[in-house]
């Protein structure tokens, strides 16, 4: 191995350092020696010599480093030359340059020159008088923003909306409390037996025999059914006892304040703080608790009282476990929260009186009246968002129609004067096998349909069809503030793809100049008129940016029109797009207020 080969890294290091220095310095010097050469290069060689040698003829050691750098980029171009010049690497000048080299280093440098010449085989364009600095360019990574086409998620319809990658605000503690109250008031099987309040507060006799509960080890249909009934009763009783506990604790807080005021009025010479301390110590003695225990409990009970003062007794009776957390940690427990609860007071009482007629019997324990304020059907009352007193449904239409009447029905009624004994919504089964066997198959999921929950396998709209018991819808009819008369408001959220309700009414045909829903089957065309009878879907207003839509669904060979949610938030109005055919030729203007409104006509209502 030669010395040059052994220190090859030194040549590379020196060459790289010189090249970087020339690039950073941006040298712009006029070197006549460079301009006179066709392919100028910079050659450097390194030797080891004795610095103390006096003789002019000093013996050189063997060369330890050698490198050549191309200086063509520093050459000043001639204006008379062609814009593009093609250069051949193998030129006579280059060969002459090699001939002038020292004979000692000729063999070692031929390889370096050949490597540099191979890198300059490409054509070079001529430049102007200003030379471009030989600096490193910053290249953008194109892989970071490649404009690729993505598959649209709407190509594959989904029942539920996929989770968004963006940040979504979660409901506040107050929102969770309100939603929990609505869910308990609407969906919970809250039952209070009539005339049983006195038995709830009456102490059981000491000689009462305990009830023995035994469960057989062998599975039996009768014992299992009995256990189901017993467990349901215990769960309902526990739920009622929890409501009684909350209203009694709220009432005790009121009596505590009344006792302090009474003692202050009787003995004004003492401060109210001393009277409060005396009443507090008396309560600790009666409860058998320490001051710390009673003080912690009173802080929560005082929260119950504040909620009762704002939202009424119904908020306490139908509140779930969320009210305990809300009153204990008091997150968002401010004046704005109390204002929102106050606006919900009458609306909560409407739902409680119409869905749970016996709930006020619990208030007899705290001395409150038991008479219902809002009896009747849940959708027979029109509520207000600002907390005003609800009014009967007929009162909102009597100004325009003195003979207005509306009957709330669960199933559509076929107009016998038009269709006779036939139902125009009938959809025959496509398969001859299913027609012969008498079974009903769903056209969407291809599963068996039946009103018997044990036999039903179709769960396209489980809240409406094939369920054990259809629950009341979490909606109320409310008075809109935009001049649209009545509207439909959602008390809880409706997930995307879930059913809001079925459009029921009079199945007829030939109705003109009235709001109707048109439907058709392969055998007939029909109309659903909800002018005199129907359900809450009648009050869904139009919006050009609706959050619900109508959809056809066949159940037991009968076509139904379902109002399906597109994603409805709790507390928002439920709207549907009536369509172009409805607005064609109609002398009215759309009042939806959306920026994408399609039927806004100036000067019309």
From Swiss-Prot:
EC number: 2.1.1.-
GO molecular function annotation: histone H3 methyltransferase activity
Domain of life: Eukaryota
Biased composition (Polar residues): 75-89
Enzyme class label: transferase
Protein's UniProt keywords contain Methyltransferase: yes
One GO CC term on file: chromatin
Domain annotation SET: ranges: 473-579
Keywords for this protein: Methyltransferase, S-adenosyl-L-methionine, Transferase
Pfam families: SET
Residue segments, region Disordered: 68-132
InterPro entries named in the record: Class_V-like_SAM-MTase, SET_dom, SET_dom_sf
Biased composition (Acidic residues): 104-115
GO biological process: methylation
Family listed: Belongs to the class V-like SAM-binding methyltransferase superfamily.
Name this polypeptide is given: SET domain-containing protein SNOG_11806
Species the sequence originates in: Phaeosphaeria nodorum (strain SN15 / ATCC MYA-4574 / FGSC 10173) (Glume blotch fungus)
């Amino acid at each position: 191995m030669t010395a040059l080969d052994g220190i090859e890294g030194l040549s590379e290091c020196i060459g790289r350092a010189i090249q970087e220095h020339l690039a950073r310095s941006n040298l712009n010097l006029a070197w006549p020696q460079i301009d006179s050469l066709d392919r100028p290069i910079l050659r450097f060689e390194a030797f080891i010599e004795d610095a103390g040698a006096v003789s002019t003829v000093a013996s050189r050691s063997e060369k330890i480093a050698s490198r050549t750098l191309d200086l063509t980029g520093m050459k000043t171009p001639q204006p008379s030359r062609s814009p593009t010049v093609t250069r051949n690497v193998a030129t006579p000048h280059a060969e002459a340059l090699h001939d002038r080299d020292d004979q000692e280093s000729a063999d070692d440098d031929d390889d370096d020159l050949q490597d540099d010449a191979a890198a300059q085989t490409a054509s070079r364009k001529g430049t102007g008088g200003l030379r471009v600095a030989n600096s490193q360019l910053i290249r953008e990574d194109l892989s970071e923003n490649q404009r690729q086409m993505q598959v649209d998620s709407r190509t594959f319809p989904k029942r539920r909306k996929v989770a968004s990658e963006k940040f979504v605000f979660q409901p506040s503690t107050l929102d969770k409390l309100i939603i929990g109250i609505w869910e308990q008031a609407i969906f919970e099987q809250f039952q209070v037996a009539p005339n049983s309040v006195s038995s709830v507060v009456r102490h059981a006799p000491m000689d009462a025999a305990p009830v023995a509960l035994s469960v057989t080890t062998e599975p039996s249909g009768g014992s299992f059914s009995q256990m189901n009934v017993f467990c349901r009763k215990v769960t309902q009783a526990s739920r009622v006892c929890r409501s009684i506990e909350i209203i009694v604790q709220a009432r005790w807080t009121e009596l505590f304040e009344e006792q302090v005021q009474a003692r202050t009025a009787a003995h004004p010479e003492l401060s109210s703080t001393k009277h409060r301390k005396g009443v507090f110590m008396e309560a600790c003695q009666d409860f058998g608790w320490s001051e710390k225990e009673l003080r912690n409990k009173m802080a929560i009970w005082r929260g119950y009282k504040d909620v009762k003062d704002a939202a009424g007794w119904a908020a306490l009776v139908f509140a779930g476990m969320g009210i305990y957390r809300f009153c204990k940690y008091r997150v968002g427990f401010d004046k704005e929260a109390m204002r929102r609860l106050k606006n919900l007071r009458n609306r909560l009482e409407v739902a409680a009186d119409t869905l749970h007629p016996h709930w006020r019997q619990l208030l007899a324990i705290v001395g409150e009246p038991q008479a219902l304020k809002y009896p009747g059907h849940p959708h027979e009352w029109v509520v207000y968002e600002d907390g005003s007193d609800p009014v009967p449904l007929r009162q909102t239409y009597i100004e325009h129609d003195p003979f207005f009447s509306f009957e709330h029905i669960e199933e559509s009624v076929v107009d016998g004067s038009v269709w006779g004994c036939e139902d125009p919504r009938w959809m025959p089964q496509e398969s001859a096998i299913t027609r012969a066997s008498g079974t009903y198959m769903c056209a969407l999921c291809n599963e068996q349909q039946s009103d018997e929950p044990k036999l039903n396998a179709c769960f396209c709209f489980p809240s409406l069809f094939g369920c054990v018991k259809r629950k009341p819808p979490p909606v109320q009819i409310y008075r809109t503030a935009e001049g649209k008369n009545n509207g439909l408001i959602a008390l809880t959220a409706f997930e995307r793809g879930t059913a809001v309700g079925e459009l029921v009414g009079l199945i007829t045909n030939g109705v003109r100049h009235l709001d109707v829903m048109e439907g058709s089957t392969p055998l007939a065309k029909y109309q659903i008129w909800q002018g005199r009878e129907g359900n809450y879907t009648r009050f869904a207003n139009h919006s050009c940016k609706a959050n619900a839509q109508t959809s056809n669904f066949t159940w037991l060979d009968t076509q139904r029109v379902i109002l399906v949610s597109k994603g409805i938030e709790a507390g928002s109005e439920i709207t549907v797009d009536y369509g172009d055919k409805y607005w064609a030729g109609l002398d009215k203007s759309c009042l939806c207020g959306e920026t994408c409104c399609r039927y806004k006509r100036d000067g019309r209502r």
